[in-house]
């Protein structure tokens, strides 16, 4: 089951009603998204062995909040959505959509915001990025989108991705279309941009009990039914793992068919869980899953595999 973005003027009234029943997509709600993430990261940093890094990630998330409002994006995506719909592609496909200079403008603004807060190696990294040429930055962005993580040092990747993510989230927030569910493949990827999820969440409120995967780039969430592998869509060999007990707010769903796992966060167990923050703060669970022989099917925007310089 895949999800395709349908332009507003191509939706009939019956399709609009169907889409309203179970929203296949939840476009990013940028108001307070980054502040909420930063607050959750700081909260989780208390008594966590990764506390220093969680506080570092909180600084980046807060900077994203500031830059979001200082550098708004104005863009008409109507033509792009129509073209992508005709091609059956995500409208903001990371492998197709040309990047304009706005994302590098966001990166420089993030660096300016973060500089007073950084010291030591972290400060050296952002100063290095500040001096990089336009082409060098584009090459790093292309490498990350191609999953060529060895070409971008793991200390630079979070800053590059923070700017790219903010840019893509701004674009996703402007999409003037609706979405509907269609049978197809590759629902393990974001239907808006084609990137990977960071984690999934069983929500409360108007989407009570529904599971949504959260994009690690454009911040869109998309519906995937529960008790089905989000990576291969099989359901016969799923297992659920937690570090605490069966009522834990964070679990890992593993699949013996494809050998991967993805974390599930349960808002009903802990209303404050946040897709990126709680995933990052629970790396002990990742270590356990690796010991069990499973590979992670997602990437956290603050923790990329790569080669340090």
UniProtKB/Swiss-Prot annotation:
Keywords associated with the record: Cytoplasm
InterPro entries for the chain: FdhE-like_sf, FdhE_C, FdhE_central, FdhE_N, Formate_DH_accessory
Recorded GO MF terms: ferric iron binding
Location of the protein in the cell: Cytoplasm
Role according to the record: Necessary for formate dehydrogenase activity.
NCBIfam families found in the cross-reference section: FdhE, PRK03564.1
Family, as annotated: Belongs to the FdhE family.
The protein, known as: Protein FdhE
UniProt organism field: Escherichia coli O139:H28 (strain E24377A / ETEC)
Gene designation: fdhE
